[in-house]
């Protein structure tokens, strides 16, 4: 396998504890809980042992609460996978695993105002009210809606999501939810927040937070790469060139959210931060282009591990 084939763009642990990975070379692999390869997802919706490429550039994967798999691509829209069959049991005392899906493809249609606002999808998220939000890199925020007869529509700034600040929120990288039903949208031009407790889409109020020069408690940078809430319900905003921004305000429905910033001056390996995840010991790992940084949120200290050293150790 080449480095190009191995580079992972998106991954998902599904409700059967299988791992889905989408590579830069357009392969989607599914692994069993024991780490063995179940197979590759084909364009026909089969999981097969034969190495087959899926469609172009999958950048995001979501399993919704009904068990459907959603795949967002860089330039050809959104795919919905619905299970239609099961395979023989995998491993000892394992439930039967799904091995075939029907595929539904959604794209931007210039003549349909309720189609996707853009075919470039970087993030898909289902919130606590079961709303599925789709973040487009070039089309802003979309709310996916489905009728009982199966018709799918997308609500965005070109139809009913009229208050969405498309001038600032055109390019969405990440969507998540903080405690209290606050949806956070990371864009290339700041952080957007709103409440998912709404009755009419036209009435949603959006709040925008950006870097304010001279204000040490504003965002360090506006290009938001990732947003993460840890087990202690503390939310962190990861910004490219701005490191880690910890939310210290109790109210996120505000245009004056206060942050505590951590960057190279505080021990972070690089300000070019990309994402964050928490481990079983409640340590937070920050991924950058050159290193992994382990952050102790109690002591507020970093331990850094250069990626080149990690790769060398794996090769020994």
PLM features: residue spans?
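Carboxylate-rich, polar loop motifs that coordinate divalent cations or form catalytic acidic clusters
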Residues: 1-316
């Amino acid at each position: 396998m080449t480095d190009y084939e191995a580079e992972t763009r998106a991954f998902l642990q599904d409700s059967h504890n299988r791992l889905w990975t989408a590579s830069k070379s357009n392969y989607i692999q599914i692994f069993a809980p024991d780490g063995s390869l179940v197979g590759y997802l084909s364009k026909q919706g089969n999981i097969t042992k034969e190495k087959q490429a899926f469609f172009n550039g999958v950048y995001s994967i979501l399993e919704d609460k009904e068990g459907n798999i959603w795949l967002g691509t860089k330039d050809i829209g959104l795919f919905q996978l619905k299970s239609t069959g099961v395979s023989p049991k995998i491993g000892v005392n394992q439930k039967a695993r799904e091995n075939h899906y029907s595929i539904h493809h959604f794209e931007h249609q210039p003549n349909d105002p309720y189609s996707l606002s853009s075919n470039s999808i970087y993030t898909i998220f289902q919130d606590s009210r079961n709303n599925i939000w789709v973040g487009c890199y070039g089309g802003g925020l979309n709310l996916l809606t489905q009728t009982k007869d199966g018709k799918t529509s997308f609500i965005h700034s070109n139809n009913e999501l009229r208050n969405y600040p498309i001038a600032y929120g055109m390019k969405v990288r990440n969507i998540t939810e903080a405690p209290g039903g606050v949806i956070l949208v990371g864009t290339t031009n700041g952080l957007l927040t709103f409440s998912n407790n709404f009755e009419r889409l036209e009435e949603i109020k959006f709040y925008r937070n950006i870097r304010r020069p001279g204000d040490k408690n504003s965002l360090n940078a506006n290009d938001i790469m990732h947003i993460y809430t840890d087990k202690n319900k503390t939310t962190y905003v990861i910004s490219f060139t701005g490191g880690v921004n910890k939310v210290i305000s109790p109210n996120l429905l505000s245009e004056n959210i206060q942050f505590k910033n951590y960057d190279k001056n505080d021990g972070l390996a690089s300000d070019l931060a990309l994402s964050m995840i928490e481990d079983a010991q409640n340590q937070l790992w920050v991924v950058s282009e050159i290193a992994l940084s382990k952050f102790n949120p109690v002591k507020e200290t970093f331990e850094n591990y250069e990626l080149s050293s990690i790769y060398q150790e794996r090769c020994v």
